[in-house]
Amino acid sequence: MLASRRFESADQVRFAGLSGDRNPMHMDPIAARRTQAGAPVVHGIHTLLWLFDSIGSKHAEIGNIATLKVRFSRMVYLGDEVEADITELTATTLRARASVEGVEVISIVAALGPLAPAAQFPIDPSADLTAQRVTAADVALRDMEARCGRIAFATEPAKMATAFPGAARMLGAHRVAALGCSTYLVGMVVPGLHSIFSGLELVLTNDTALASELQFAVTAIDARFRRVKIAINGPGLSGHLDTFSRVPPVAQLPIAQAAEHVARDEFGTTTALVVGGSRGLGELTAKLIAAGGGRVIVTYASGKADADRVAAEISGWGGSCDVIAYDVRQAADRQLESLKHTPTQLYYFATPPIAKRKPALFATEQLEEFNEFYADGFLRLVEAALRRAPNGLAAFYPSSVYVQDRPRNMVEYAMSKAAGEILCSEMARSLGSLRVLVERLPRLPTDQTASLIQVDDAGVSPLSVMLPIVRKMQQLHFVDASSRTA
């Protein structure tokens, strides 16, 4: 191993200042939770420059890099221990990688040799510089075609060289600054807000006109895979960036439209605690119940702004919605003290990030994390809610079709959901005042399931799945109430 380190929030802030890339996926934990990453991730270029810095600090004998190919194969999360390694070093070739728990996150293939002549680029060098942005551009995929321009470096090359001295010795200060500018281009300009930087291929040039700027032009878009290829030209380098435009966060049905599918007083006897009601299926469930005359309490663990938005929409329409903070990993009773009304129903949509990097076929830590949410957390909450519900409680537990039809790399998730189903059966048998509804939900368009490829969900919509469930829960509630008054 050449070197190792952990990236923390302070490192993100410093690199954002150097590069100008303040994409929320890196800087905003609340916004990042609504991306496929599920949490803030380290800038790929930051990890790359650290990798070059580690190499350059210990191998001053390496000659000129003539060409460079980089692949960002996995995301690096804050707190991950990243290891740097050289896998091959000869007179003509350098191969290196960064890894987390043995899983490769970045690979480098560099050819060593003489530099190429300065490249010509089809952008008028007298064209105006693209204005520096402090917020990432939200650009639709169709509007990225033929985008081009010039971008000034956010930081002078000398400061970048000070931050990454080993990388500057290997590449030169202007090239390090150009790489820093490339992450600003991807994260803030195009693709912008919903970007993923997947790789780059560069030819290093003997450019004597060392202007502190980067020229760029979008050269190809593959709409099916949302792939965007960007040609670049800067001081001492020329080539292209491989990027993707992520699917934007999924918006759930507005309550006014939800109301078109339910009777005004259909759920008028319901007081529903919707755990994880600040977005996704929880948000939709809260809107359906409120539109049907029910009272809802939505919870959030970290997304207070999202929960407040849902409550404001419901209240503005004329419904009833309260908001409380709730963390399923903590003791339940104290967190429920702020409830103004006693729930008759409980909907449980709490979940950690589902699609995460795995170091092996089976990851015990991931199973334990899933169980904390899907088993332990559910049991703690139900027991606490029952202590506050003298007339009993109906609870909905969302399992998954993945229990039976499991995709690759989802074994821990499927195991935990299966365990949750068994737990629900035992709870229903042991807790006489509890009614539990378990449904294996199909893949549905939510922030957690969004992907780069447009997936055909066979016409299944969140509304078509959740409305029948809410109606079944209403029947459970009536059955339970009638059994207690008989």
Question: What would you call each of these model-derived segments?
Answer:
Residues 1-7, 67-140, 204-272:
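HotDog/MaoC-like acyl-thioester-processing domains
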Residues 1-40, 117-173:
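Catalytic strand-loop segment that frames the active site of acyl-thioester-processing enzymes
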Residues 34-91, 174-215, 224-227:
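Hydrophobic beta-strand-centered segment that forms part of the acyl-chain substrate-binding groove
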Residues 245-247, 435-486:
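C-terminal helical subdomain
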Residues 259-263, 351-429, 440-447, 453:
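Catalytic loop of short-chain dehydrogenase/reductase
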Residues 278-279, 302:
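Conserved glycine-rich cofactor-binding loop
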Residues 293-309:
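Conserved glycine-rich Rossmann-like NAD(P)H-binding loop of the short-chain dehydrogenase/reductase
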Residues 314-331:
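Rossmann-fold cofactor-recognition segment
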